[in-house]
């Protein structure tokens, strides 16, 4: 859910939406950001919970899933939240993403779309193709890959550090948006 940008757009476009996050700060920021008047009949629900267990959503009831999960152990969004996958090692992160993919498949209607934005990471100078690992997890759960969009990133917080010649490696200046369909 982050700061609620997708939920704000849904409200402005008169769409129903459910936003979830494990981080209480993100929840409160989103709640504040959604507190504006506009003519809408949309239903906007926000929940403090993990995408690994969205028990309150019925099977085959969601039209579209859009998600941008945190990456494994890169930017930590909390200190001790046991549901925060940003705190996990790559191996545990991928296990958590398998649960997210299962739940996403369960709640999404057939012939509808799931879009997930995720990028690769670098640990100790070694590239970890996290995006493709996550893509394969979603495919293994039954999703059909329809498209891959490469989103270029600009003005990243640590770009100046990366550009430094002494580090001698290519920038990770993109993320993938994987477009899946549930058949």
Where do the model's predicted regions map?
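Class I S-adenosyl-L-methionine-dependent methyltransferase catalytic core
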Residues: 1-183
């Amino acid at each position: 859910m982050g700061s609620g940008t997708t939920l704000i757009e849904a409200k402005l476009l008169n769409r129903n939406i459910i936003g979830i996050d494990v981080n209480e700060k993100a929840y409160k920021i989103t709640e504040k950001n959604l507190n504006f008047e506009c003519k809408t009949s949309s239903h906007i629900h926000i929940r403090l919970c993990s995408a690994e267990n969205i028990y309150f959503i019925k099977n085959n009831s969601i039209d579209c899933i859009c998600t941008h999960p945190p990456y494994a152990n890169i930017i930590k969004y909390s200190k001790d939240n046991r549901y925060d996958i940003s705190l996990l090692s790559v191996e545990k992160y991928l296990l958590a993403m398998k649960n997210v993919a299962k739940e996403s498949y369960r709640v999404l209607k057939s012939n509808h779309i799931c879009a997930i934005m995720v990028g690769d990471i670098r640990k100790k100078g070694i590239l970890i193709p996290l995006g493709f690992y996550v893509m394969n997890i979603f495919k293994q759960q039954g999703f059909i890959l329809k498209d891959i969009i490469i989103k270029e990133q600009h003005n990243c917080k640590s770009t100046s550090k990366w550009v430094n010649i002494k580090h001698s490696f290519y920038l990770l200046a993109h993320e993938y948006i994987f477009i899946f369909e549930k058949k």
